């Protein structure tokens, strides 16, 4: 699951939150960045050799390592159809940093010394290798959970490359208004990776005129939710916003049922799990998540409306069935799609520099129809992350399964607002529009 920030994806992962506790300040903003190397290492007459850098093992591997599986599935699909300009895509160098910042920096150098053309599939809580990869102009694609990706034209996150926690407020305000919430509680852990988005959401709710009756931005991981829930019950909370991981969210749901708040909705930034919902149907009823991509459930809800997601589900089921409904694996698929789109635009004789230039001239990348358009002429900077419109899809747990909610006429799953929280039309190219 992704960290809470629009550019990074829709959900905060326990791995990121735990990482924040272990190493709170691990950002390496680049002092120098390249526009891409002039050469074409790893490119031969019949293949393009790339690498990946993920936390495949170690205490923080869950929620990061599976990005590589999404990349593999997309490459397998492309290779089955002849590759790109007759070259097969070869994910030959798969480095594992085991969630260790020092190892990550070393493995980034290993990838360069191994002469890979690009790094496709970065999934790690500590991307300390970002600065070096940016300096040498290595095209790099991955799951963005830190500001290490900011302002580097060769680094490409799945949904943009500038981390901005403040953008979470737009989804929260939209959901609160759709639910006609009158008393909102907001709860997070006491670490920036969790608290920043929830604090921004509370501020946005208040700015939008939605009453926030209870706040706790210092809840402890694995703590007792009852004291908070007792106060929430006294204030008649009808919507809970949480920036926590799945088991703590479930503990809050259980306590809310015990103290008379079982009919309240909850907006969880993290915790999307088909198994958890199926195992706890009554506790999870009314839980809402937001997606920056077409929800997996939209294929069933709106047959034929979202062919790109249908293709994703089909190909992932074929090549990586364990990870079909995993959001980090999905981001790996998007990373691979971005890489391939750039290769095709760069032409039959690509260099690292021409690949980067091709992607950074793209103004409406949707991964073939999976997400609202990303404008790469702006998506590396804070200006691009705050411009809007802000579009998301929403799913709700109902009787042990997820269903799309807040949909528009004709099965449009994306709802968009401007910086004043006013509904606006989806940008051209948005799936389902």
Which residues are covered by each model-predicted region?
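Beta-alpha junction/loop-to-helix N-cap segments that form part of ligand/metal-binding clefts
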Residues: 33-38, 62-69, 80-150, 218-226, ...
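Extracytoplasmic "Venus flytrap"
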Residues: 36-72, 94-101, 188-196, 324-331
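Bacterial signal peptide processing site
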Residues: 27-29
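Extracytoplasmic ligand/sensor domains, especially the bilobed periplasmic-binding protein
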Residues: 116-217, 264-289
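Bacterial N-terminal signal peptides that target proteins for export
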Residues: 1-14
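C-terminal motif of bacterial Sec signal peptides marking the signal peptidase cleavage site
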Residues: 22-25
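Extracellular/periplasmic periplasmic-binding protein-like sensory domains
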Residues: 158-161, 255-333, 409, 413, ...
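Segments of small-molecule ligand-sensing domains
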Residues: 318-329, 340-404
